[in-house]
C-alpha cells in the first residue's frame, strides 16, 4: 500500500494523527480513513477548513469579515483600554479583535448581528452605539470582567452576603448620594475583594489573617480608585486568564459555606491560577517528577518537547473522518463542566455546578432557612468532583499503546500549588463490566452527571461490580476481583460508602490522584505511587495493551506501571476535577508529547521481535520448570510415551536431509520437488481436496535460528522472487554472492551448497522465459508498447490470440502513451488521438463477437481515458482519478504485472511466488490475532507481542 502514497499524502497523515499510532497496526485503519476522504484534503487549500493554527479554540470560525467601520470602532475602544500594545491596525486580524473585545464586553454574542448586518430596508450598516456610549465611566470600562474562578467565589460567598443584606442596606442608607453610583458600579468587586486577597507578595502567601485585612482595605477604596491603576490592570489582560495570573495565591475560607471542602486536611486550601507563561505548549518551566535525581533530565526533556504539530485542521475534521479514537472530552448534560470549543484546550468544573444540584437560591428565603439547607446538603452525599470522559473508547483489538497528556493550568492546593484536586486515568466502559454476584449496592442518586455510561445519563446499572471470586482482608472488607486480579470495587461490611462515592467520581476508574500521589481503582485501598502533581505539571496516562498495564508519566518521566493484568477490557480516558482546578489536554493530534512515547513503544517492539526470533527457545525455557517431573514420567512410562511431551527433543530431532518431519507420510516426490519442500517452496500438504486441514503435528514450521535452515530458506525465496519478477541478471548476481559466502568449515557448508545448486537449476531452467519477460519489462518501461506487442507475437505466438484482455491492456497503454507525449497545440496530434480512440472503440466495444461483460468493462476504461483529451495538460489539470492512468505505476509496473501473470498462466506456471505468499499469510495471521484478541504464549496474562508488530512498516519498509 505504501508504494502508491506520495509525499503529500504522508504529510497529511503525519499532521492528522499521532506519530506513535502510525507505527502500530492501527496505522492501516488510519490510512483507510484518510484515503476515503483523500479528495477532501487535496482541496483544503481553497477552503476554510484550515485555520492556520492561529485559533485553536475555534473562536470566530465561519464568521464574515468585519467591515471597515466595525473594525475601526473595535480598535478604538480596545486602544483606549490599552490592551492591544504595539500591534498595528493593519497587522491585527479580525478573529483576534473579536476575541479580545468579547472578553471585555461579554454581553456581545454575535458581532455580525450587532455591527456588520445590513438593514434590509435602508441598505445601511448599523454602527455599534452613539459616541456618548464611548464616554462611559472610565472605571467601568477598564474594570476586567470577573473570571470563572471569581464567579465560583461569588457563588460560595453569596450565602454569607445574603445573610448580611440588612446590614448592607443600613450602610447604604447612611452613604451620601454622590457615592451611590460608584458603590453600585463596584458592588460585585467589593463583594469579591472581601473574600479574595490580591496581594502578590510571596512572603504573605500563606498568612490568612494578613490577606484578609488587605482584602478589606481594597474593598474600602470604592469610587476613589485611580483610573491609571485600573488601566495597568487592564494592560495585563491579554487573554481571559492573565488577570488570574497576576495573583500569586487566593485564599479560600474553609468555613461551612465552602461546599467542596471535605476534610480537615484541606483546611489551608488555596487557589493557584495559571502561570504567566504565554506559551500554549505542553512544555513547563517547573519540573517535579517525584524523583529528585531525575529533575535535570526532565528539564532537558521539557525544553525539547511539547512542540506544536503542523496540524492546522479544525477539530470537526475528525468527526468528518470518523476518527474512532479519543479526540476531545465529552460535554456533560448537567452542565457540571466548562469545556472549550475544541474540547481539549481548557477544561474546568462549572463554578455554579453545586447550586444546580442542591437547591434554588431565593432572595426571599430567610438566612436561617438557607443555613439549614446548606447544612443538610453538606451532611448528605454531596459531589466534590466533576467528571468527564473522552468521546471515544479504546478498541483493544486495534491498539498497541494509547497515551495522552494533560497540563495542569490552575489548582486548589494545600502545598503551594505542588498538589491539585485532579484525578486522571481510565474508566472501564459500561459494556465491559461484569454482572455482580452480590445484590448489595450503594445508591448514587446524589451523584449527578457521573454515571458509568458514555452517554452521560444516570443509570443504576453503573453500580454493577465484577463477579467471580472475592478475598477477605481481615474482617472489614470484601473485594470483588476481576479475572486478572484487579480490584474493581470495594464495599465496607458496615455499609459505609467507598471512595468513589465519597468524592463523586465513577466506579471502575483506574486513576492517579493529584492531591496525595496515590493510585486508586475507586476503592478505599489506594496505593502509594508517586508524589502529587500540581500547577504546570504535565501528567501523561498510557495504557499498554501488550501486557495489559496502565502507567503514568510526570513531566516526561515514566513513573512505572500503576495497574496490571487489565487484558480484554475496554477503557476510555477519564478525568475528575474539583472546582478551582483546570487542565489542558493533549491527545497527540495538535501537539507532540512531552514524554518520549515513541521510544517507549520501540522498546516493546524490540521485545516483540526478540520474542518472535527466539520463540522456540522460549518454549524450551518454559519446559525447564517441569524438568524434574519429565524425568519421573520418563522413568515410569518409558521413553516412548515421553517422546511426544519433550519439547527439547522435538526441537533437536530435525531431519536436515529428508526435509520436515511433517512430510514423512506424504507421497514420494522427485528430487526437484523434494528439494523445494525442503525450503518450503513446494506444495502445501495441509491442503486436501482444496480444503485446509489441521496437521497432526504440533510444529509445522521447523525453521530455527540455531542452524542454517532459516537463512537458507530465505535465500531460496529471494531467488524465486527475482526469477518470478524477470530479474534474471539480479538473480545471477545474488547467486555469485551466495557462492562467495559459502565457506567450507568442518562440513557445515553442505546446506549452503544445496541452496546454491537449487538456485542454479532454477535460473538455468527459467533463463529463456526470464529473458523474454525481462525484454518485456524493458520495452514497457521505455513506453515502446507497439514493439512489445510484436515481440510477444514472435516469441509466444498463441498468447495474444487466446488473451483478449491482455491485448486490450497493451493497446490501451499505447493510447495512453500517445496522450502523455502529445501537445495540445498540435492539431495533427489531436486528430490522430481522436482517430486512435475511435479505432479502439470499434475493435473492443462495438465488436459483437466479444462477450457483453468484457465490452462493458472495456467501454468504462476507454471512457475514463478519453476524458483526458479535454485537458491541455492532463498530468497537471486532470483530476487524480483519471490522471492516474498516465502515472508510471499504471503504465509500467501494473502493465508488466498483468503481462507477466498472463504469461505464467499461459505456460501453466504458478503466477505467485513463495515470498509473496509468506507475506500475505503473515498479514492474514496478524490480522486474525488482532481481530480475536488472542492470548499470549500460554495464557491470557502473558504479553501479547503480536500487538506491537506493524509488518508493512517494520519489515517491508526497512
From Swiss-Prot:
Any GO BP: regulation of nitrogen utilization
Composition-biased stretches (Polar residues): 297-306
Residue spans of biased composition, Acidic residues class: 163-208, 624-639
Modified residues annotated as Phosphoserine in this record: 147, 246, 248, 277
PANTHER family linked: RAN BINDING PROTEIN 9-RELATED
Function according to Swiss-Prot or TrEMBL: Component of the GID E3 ligase complex recruiting N termini and catalyzing ubiquitination of proteins targeted for degradation. GID E3 is regulated through assembly with interchangeable N-degron-binding substrate receptors induced by distinct environmental perturbations. Required for the adaptation to the presence of glucose in the growth medium; mediates in association with the substrate receptor VID24/GID4 the degradation of enzymes involved in gluconeogenesis when cells are shifted to glucose-containing medium.
SUBUNIT field: Identified in the GID/CTLH complex. In the absence of stress, the complex exists as an inactive anticipatory complex (GID(Ant)), composed of VID30/GID1, the E3 ubiquitin-ligase RMD5/GID2, VID28/GID5, GID8, and the RING-like subunit FYV10/GID9, awaiting a substrate receptor to form the active E3 ligase complex. When cells are shifted to glucose-containing medium, the substrate receptor VID24/GID4 is induced and becomes part of the complex, named GID(SR4).
Protein name: GID complex subunit 1
Source organism of this protein record: Saccharomyces cerevisiae (strain ATCC 204508 / S288c)
